[in-house]
C-alpha cells in the first residue's frame, strides 16, 4: 500500500464542477492499493500517515504530526501509484489491487482515520477528479508498507 503525502496549506477535489472535499492546513494523501494489500497493512499505513512528523515546531524543525499541528486529511484514491515503470515507455498496472479490493481498503483507510478523530475529507473513488493544492514547503513523502 502506498501513500504519497503532501503537506498543504490548502487542497480540494472537484468532480463535475463541484467541490466534494476540501481542507486547509494538513496532508493531501494520494492512496494506491497493491494486490497484496490487506486491512493490517492499511491500518499500519494510516497510523504512519497520521503520526508522521512533517509539520514545523516552534524552532522550524519538522517535529509535529498531523494532530499536534491541528491539521486535516484529504484522501484521494490513485491507482497509478501502483504502476510498474521499470520497463518500456508505458506503465504496467498488473501489481495494482483490483477495483473492489482498492475501494474496500480506500474506504477502510478513510474510516480508520476518522475513527481516530482526524478531520478527514475525501475525493470520489474511481472518478475523474481535479485536485488542486498549495504544497507547503514543498514537502512530499512517499510512504509504503
From Swiss-Prot:
Gene: dtd
GO biological process, one term: D-amino acid catabolic process
The organism of origin for this protein: Shewanella pealeana (strain ATCC 700345 / ANG-SQ1)
Annotated transmembrane regions: none
Record remark: domains: A Gly-cisPro motif from one monomer fits into the active site of the other monomer to allow specific chiral rejection of L-amino acids.
SUPFAM superfamilies: DTD-like
Short name of any one Pfam family annotated for the protein: Tyr_Deacylase
EC number: 3.1.1.96
Catalysed reaction, written as an equation: glycyl-tRNA(Ala) + H2O = tRNA(Ala) + glycine + H(+); a D-aminoacyl-tRNA + H2O = a tRNA + a D-alpha-amino acid + H(+)
The protein's name: D-aminoacyl-tRNA deacylase
Subunit structure comment from the entry: Homodimer.
Compartment(s) where it occurs, according to its Swiss-Prot or TrEMBL record: Cytoplasm
